[in-house]
Amino acid sequence: VTSNLYESKEYSDIREVIKDGINRYPDCVAFTIKNKEGKDIQYTDITYAEFEKEINSLGTGLLKLGLKDKKIAIIGPNSYEWVLSYISVLFGIGIVVPLDKGLPAQEIEDSIIRSDADALIFDPKYIDIIEDIKQRSTTKVKEFICMKEVESKEINNIPKIKKIGKEELDKGNKEFFELKIEPEKTSIILFTSGTTSLS
């Protein structure tokens, strides 16, 4: 009898899983991004190899901001920037805290406080809520990072951080590549759908 089973492969962490996919399919499309401006719609493909470069740039940039071993919350609808941020943090930077995109403003603030987040990466649609939270200084967040470019001196953004990271990589900075992932160490804090600020 001929076996149709595939040979399994064991991984020790999420970084190995992602890296394996990148090495196997570097030129294959990993993401297709839909860009809409008015009635004009364009699609941009990102290969696995390009995704790896983006992870390395963002990860190195986040480390340059002093976020090693810090808690980094992320909020926003499904997007390439959300996935990029999430994976970059899981590559050994610190603890990722994904927040429900449907939370009301007060619950967003409460979740940030409860998770003790040091940084917050957010979609532009939350800019008003985030600026309000920032003004009140109720959280310990030191880095507010928008997923897109914004006109604000007080709020950072992913394109800017990726640029800083790439410059560091070009200088030979290997800190991001040398990060160790400890299997028993907390890497994610999840709030379930039933979690409230009081539970």
Question: Language model features by range: what are they?
Answer:
Residues 72, 89, 120, 186, ...:
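Conserved S/T- and glycine-rich ATP-binding loop of Class I adenylate-forming
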Residues 1-16, 34-35:
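Flexible, non-catalytic linker and terminal segments flanking ANL/adenylate-forming cores
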Residues 56-60, 113-116, 197:
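Solvent-exposed alpha-helix faces
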Residues 91-164, 177:
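Structural core segment of the AMP-binding/adenylate-forming
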Residues 10, 27-87, 104-109, 165-168:
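Conserved AMP-binding/adenylate-forming core of the ANL superfamily
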Residues 26-29, 146, 163-191, 198:
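Conserved pre-ATP/AMP-binding loop-to-beta segment of ANL
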